[in-house]
Structures are given as structure tokens and as C-alpha cells.
Amino acid sequence: MHVDTPQSCCRFAIAHGDITPPADIYHRMWGAAKHDRATGIHQPLRATVILLAPAEGDERQFIIALDHCVMGRREMDNLLEVVSKGTGIAHADCIVVFSHTHAAGLMGLERADLPGGDLIAPYLEDLSKRVVELLSLIHI
């Protein structure tokens, strides 16, 4: 007896790069932390971007994976806007996921007045630009 096994083909691309924030950025992530600013870099943070598309056709889905814990709505909207303007990729074609590491700190723009918080907005701008660079490497 012959059993047909469903198979599919797709196009796949992946790129990754460093997104480590500056060592003295505001870092307090949870209540037990004993300091506000990061005192160094233990391990670098990474962004990974993935493209999934059918073997034929124009449909595309992009996955943006960031070594961060979470991102607020305002920060997410800013990221997706920069990505859309920089690549032409629609917001609806992007899924952003997080590794959920508490080592990255909480990069909320509302923390700008805290020690090292002045580095958050420039870091998030650089992060968005880095994601655009990575997406441009896999845009097929």
C-alpha cells in the first residue's frame, strides 16, 4: 500500500547580529537588583531575523527575535515603524518575539530620567536600525 506523505517547500533565510546595549545603560529589571546601571557586559545580546515564504508567490512572513525580556507598546510601535520605513515590510508581515532574558534590562522610554536612562532612547534607535540592516540581508 502506498501512502502519500504531504510535503511542502518554502523559501527560508536567516541573519543575526549583535544588539548589545552600552555597558552603563539603565539596567534594573527586577526588585532584587542592587544597582541601576549595568556595570559591564557578561554576554552580548543578539537579534535574529528569519524570512519564511512559499516556494512561489509573494507572501512573506518575517520573524524578528530579540534578546530582550519584553518591549512596551510605544517601543514596539517605534521599532515596527522604523522597520516598515526602512524595508518596505508591512507591520502585519512581522512577528517580534523575545528570548525573555532579564539580563537585558527593561528598555522602557519612561525610564529616561533614571541613572543611565538617557541611553535607552538612543539604544532603541540603534536597535531598530540594526534590525533593518539584518532584514536587508535576507530580503528575497
Where are these regions (language model features)?
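Conserved beta-alpha junction segments in alpha/beta enzyme cores
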Residues: M1-V97, T101-I138
